[in-house]
Design a protein with these regions (language model features):
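Active-site and adjacent substrate-binding regions of carbohydrate-active enzymes
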Residues: 1-191
Length: 191
């Protein structure tokens, strides 16, 4: 609600877009605004677990902020460098996550439902089917996250055998994000 903060974000986005970056990853995209009155977060007996119904998640003001940022990104659609984009980082179930991916909000997101799914055919099938349906409902591409810096490395979780899954097919109906290759020698260590 502070116009100075909103305008500073506008300036920062334009600064980097003007220099040709492709986009931004919005960390904890569902927690950029806290409930009015700034109430305390409920106590959580298990340190590190997210409190689902708290004053810092999914606040209505997020929509206007994300629409404001999207409008700025859309200003660059016809530039020589091409369109700009936003990627949401938020650990949310599909039905809540895709609200952030409506056509006038963020472009896509990391799909952590896939990351936390059991490594079993039925579980993966359900996760993939639900994810594709949810993303299709808002016209966004689904992504498939196997690992990140918050979780044990995939090689430790899934074993060292070659998997039958191939996420490198560019014709598949999902987006691909490739970060720094993981080092198998690190084993269970996080990035």
């Amino acid at each position: 609600e502070n116009s100075d903060v909103l305008e500073e974000f506008d300036r920062v986005l334009r600064f980097w877009f003007d220099r040709g970056i492709d986009g931004f990853r919005i960390d904890v995209a569902n927690s950029l605004v806290k409930e009015s009155g700034l109430p305390d977060l409920p106590e959580n007996e298990k340190f590190g677990e997210l409190v689902g119904d708290s004053p810092m998640w999914d606040q209505p003001e997020l929509a206007s902020i994300q629409r404001r940022w999207r409008a700025i990104a859309d200003e660059y659609a016809d530039t020589p460098e091409g369109p700009r984009m936003f990627v949401a980082e938020a650990y949310l179930p599909h039905d809540r996550l895709v609200r952030y991916l409506e056509s006038d909000r963020l472009h896509t997101s990391f799909n952590f439902e896939f990351l936390i799914s059991a490594w079993k055919a039925n579980s993966l099938r359900t996760t993939i089917t639900e994810s594709l349906a949810a993303h299709e409902s808002v016209g966004a591409s689904a992504t498939w996250v196997l690992g990140n810096h918050d979780n044990v490395r995939p090689v430790s979780r899934y074993g060292k055998e070659i998997s039958g899954l191939d996420f490198s097919d560019p014709s598949a109906p999902h987006a691909q994000f490739h970060g720094t290759p993981t080092d198998v020698a690190l084993g269970r260590c996080r990035a």
